Amino acid sequence: MVALYFMMDEKLIELGLIKNLETGRCEYDSYIRNGMLMQLRRLGIGDNIGEAHMRNRAWVSHWVVEQAAKDNCIREINREGKTYYNIEDYGRVRELFGELLREVQRIKSQGDYEAAKALVEGYGVKVDPEIHKQVLSRAEALGIAPYGGFINPKLVATTDTSGAILDVTL
């Protein structure tokens, strides 16, 4: 959540880490889409979310979308039997990530187990069966795997006698 909050911070541009806030907007779009929809491809019909990372994405996304609906800064769009989430106000969504981050920090610092349980179980476990069927149908039509992965290359440094790196090969 710290990264989500800071993805829309001008300081990242100042530090040269991103060129503009479009990077943050894309990350917000991706995070909400994944937490609300895409990760459901990994579950069978009727399953609850059990994996910790999936629960985390789900409860953060569901909480933010629920709060955002109050002032229409994220709209749920249903068109031709498909559900989409459209962020209308990225600044407000950033504020919501900040509010949730503050609450999580409070929970951690006070050891408030019941509040943590309420967030995870209230927002991160149950799956809307209609949305789930929709996601599975859409994914099946695309014929793509429900998981992505990374291949980490082995990098080998060539150094001089003082240890300075001269070259790196794969």
Where do the model's predicted regions map?
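Non-catalytic terminal regions of proteins
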Residues: 77-170
